[in-house]
Amino acid sequence: MLIQFLTKIFSNHNNRILKKFKKIVLSVNKLEKNFEKLSDKELQAQTELFRLRLRNGETLDDILPEAFALVREASKRVFSMRHFDVQILGGIALNKQCIAEMRTGEGKTLTSTLPAYLNALNGKGVHIVTMNDYLARRDAEKNTPLFEFLGLTVGLNLSEMSFFSKRKAYLSDITYGTNNEYGFDYLRDNMVFSPEERVQRKLNYALVDEVDSILIDEARTPLIISGPSEDSSELYKEINKIVPFLNSQKKEDSDIFCGTGDFSIDEKSKQIYLTERGLIKVEKILFDKKLMNTGESLYSSNNIILMHHVLSALRAHKLFVRNVDYLVKDNSVIIVDEHTGRTMPGRRWSDGLHQAIEAKENVSIKNENQTLASITFQNYFRLYEKIAGMTGTAETESFEFNSIYNLDTIVIPTNRKMIRKDFPDLVYMTEKEKINAIIQDIQKCIKLNQPVLVGTVSIEKSEIISKELLKLNINHNVLNAKFHAKEAEIIAQAGKPGSITIATNMAGRGTDIVLGGNLEVELNKYKNITSRKIEEIKKKWQSEHDLVVSAGGLHIIGTERHESRRIDNQLRGRSGRQGDTGSSRFYLSMEDSLMRIFASDKIVHMMKKLGLAFNEAIEHSWVTKAIENAQKKVENRNFDIRKQLLEYDDVINEQRSAIYSQRNKLIDARDIKLMIYDIFKDVLKKNIILYIPKNTFHDKWNITDLKDKLNIDFYLNAPILDWINIEPNLTDKKIIKRIIDFARINYKNKEILIGSNNMRIIEKIIMLQTLDSLWKEHLAAVDYLRQGIHLRGYAQKDPKQEYKRESFNMFSSMLELLKFEVVSFLSRINSSYAKKYIDLNKHLVITHNNTMKISRNSPCLCGSGKKYKYCHGSL
């Protein structure tokens, strides 16, 4: 009842929004004839007129109808394609910072040209975000003629590009690129030493294609720039040898099996836990291998790394499967994206898991990496002033889009009515029976000349289906992480009569499957082609198109249900584009991962009670409903994980924003002399008062230790005893001031020897290098804190609040250490070392034209909310 009520509310909200948007569509349509009358030159001149109107105070919403009408007319002239009204609707939704759900084949690429053009008019830049380099290049090449006709520049941002190419791409009005590359460029920009090394401008408007894949599926994977850490490959090899001696606990909660296993597996959360028996066994093995001292516990603080290695090794062996989660190629372990089935070269699992899998597979173990900079996609895309996205499947995730990104989901109606037939699921007892049924369905379609797209959830499953088809000499194409070089070409021709295509987790997403095959791809095979040949190819294509339509269109076969209903809908959505005929059916077994882990015992009990014969399936709405409920459980669990990840990452995100903001101010400043003086004063005072109590005279002061401290840490030989002898009644305030003044004079004398310009250069480089070094260490420390913070729950403490409190304290300590390290280094530097230091770092030296000083009344860098003068700038 509640779900029906909420669905009704959402439906009404969607209809109300569409009603408003349709009024704007009418305005666009009314302008169409006016723009048709304009010459090409008059049409092109509109762009500069729009920009002038924006500079004079009009808003993007004010000029939207005219801008959209202009793009529609330009598209008719450049592409011979007219935007449908539903595409205008989609464009309006995207400009209003919404997620536009547009079904497959509804022309999302053409729709994107509308908001991209409009939002590029203010000169701040538009980033169009795609899932991979191929789609970025394809869409850029496809839409560039239109944008250039309208006087806009288009850039392409790919991973292999040079600094200058990237800079040029980002300076373009519209930039195409992948989510990974935009994110990494942001992180790299916050690691540079001069403004000239940055490639990105201020983040203005992001238009995300396949937004559900990027903002939902990849939300749990942070972008990380890392550097090499110490070599611990031998330890991974030794720990890997322990795993065969450990046995899994079969039924964790059963008294019969109590104490018989060494570890328990939680498949839902992909975690492994040592039992008490396992702990004792592991400790004994580690004692024997001399990796741990006798009498110590694996849980003691100095052995926590060993514990981490053991659990990583167990996860590598028991939870991560070759050809499902990863491939082994060229003596390397390559991650397979669980959502797309594509390989992710260069990506590595963190926390030692990747090294543990390398040890398991007996390939070369690469050093662990230390995080230098990181950010989640959730927090990166929230940096944009405006963000919008489009996909064919967003409605099931509308709550998450709204709660995390504050984006409404608008379901855009199709241009033509959807007539695809979605048949009920067929559920078998075993995997073997299910495979038999799938092969029979494929054979039936071949007889009808009906094309088939088989969707699998892993490389392993796609290869099982492929082997069965090869046994029967059935020609087919396989699209998975192993064979993706011609992915788009294969998927484009998957609509040919009788063609069989197997795709892992919808590889090839972003390319339309046209019934009869893709005519454009067929024509592009020829470099020089006569009009007669074109007509011949078109005639053949029309014949094959009609044959496929009469056979029932593209038939989709799902080999099992995915954890998310949305991924299932993506697979189904490949069929039935633009009113085409089509059909879909999912084949399941009780041995499927989803059914085994998440389906209720009632389904299993019912299946057994029915006493199904071999190769007999159950087809019932009750079963389908139960499966959907299992999927909803997983979706809710995954949403909770992503939400919790964001809540934890928000803590470090505040600190990251503060560090990056101050770092950029440092880089943009001509010099930081005044800031350095403030830091000197602050650091010296905080160290002096440790030896000189407040409101006291010299008889209460620890002068000997103070002089040692000043000499060792700050190379300062202050004549404190001489001052006291001359003026016995010196107060604590006066002596502190005198030491600070002495240090300032000492520093000025040093500056005379080194040279003012050189000193300014050294100050900035030292500040930046020390900040980067400490920030790197802070990220590692916070990561360790995060890994163990859940244990605070056993002490009746809120782990999140404890994490916030401790990470803030760690951040404050880091800032204090930063100031101390900078002052200590600058105090010790001499003229000869200064010259060597500048020569060593001259590639970092850039001059600027403004001076930086942190305002005493501005918010403190640490994020406490206090003014700088009352927090880390206090004197």
UniProtKB/Swiss-Prot annotation:
Cellular compartment(s): Cell inner membrane; Cytoplasm
Bound cofactor: record note: May bind 1 zinc ion per subunit.
Keywords: ATP-binding, Cell inner membrane, Cell membrane, Cytoplasm, Membrane, Metal-binding, Nucleotide-binding, Protein transport, Translocase, Translocation, Transport, Zinc
Transmembrane segments: none
Molecular function GO labels: ATP binding; metal ion binding; protein-exporting ATPase activity
Assigned EC number: 7.4.2.8
Gene3D superfamilies per the UniProt record, alphabetical: Helical scaffold and wing domains of SecA, P-loop containing nucleotide triphosphate hydrolases, SecA, preprotein cross-linking domain
One cellular component term from this protein's GO annotations in UniProt: cell envelope Sec protein transport complex
Topological relation to the membrane, as annotated: Peripheral membrane protein
Annotated binding of ATP, by residue: Q87, G105, E106, G107, K108, T109, D512
Expression induction: Repressed under conditions of excess protein secretion capacity and derepressed when protein secretion becomes limiting. This is regulated by SecM.
Swiss-Prot/TrEMBL catalytic activity: ATP + H2O + cellular proteinSide 1 = ADP + phosphate + cellular proteinSide 2
Binding site for Zn(2+): C860, C862, C871, H872
CDD domains referenced in this protein's UniProt entry, alphabetically: DEXDc_SecA, SF2_C_secA
Cofactors that this protein relies on: Zn(2+)
Pfam families: P-loop_SecA, SEC-C, SecA_DEAD, SecA_PP_bind, SecA_SW
Annotated GO biological process: intracellular protein transmembrane transport; protein import; protein targeting; protein transport by the Sec complex
Function per UniProt: Part of the Sec protein translocase complex. Interacts with the SecYEG preprotein conducting channel. Has a central role in coupling the hydrolysis of ATP to the transfer of proteins into and across the cell membrane, serving both as a receptor for the preprotein-SecB complex and as an ATP-driven molecular motor driving the stepwise translocation of polypeptide chains across the membrane.
NCBIfam families: PRK12904.1 (NF009538), secA (TIGR00963)
Quaternary structure, from the entry: Monomer and homodimer. Part of the essential Sec protein translocation apparatus which comprises SecA, SecYEG and auxiliary proteins SecDF-YajC and YidC.
Family of the protein in this entry: Belongs to the SecA family.
Protein name: Protein translocase subunit SecA
Record organism: Buchnera aphidicola subsp. Acyrthosiphon pisum (strain Tuc7)
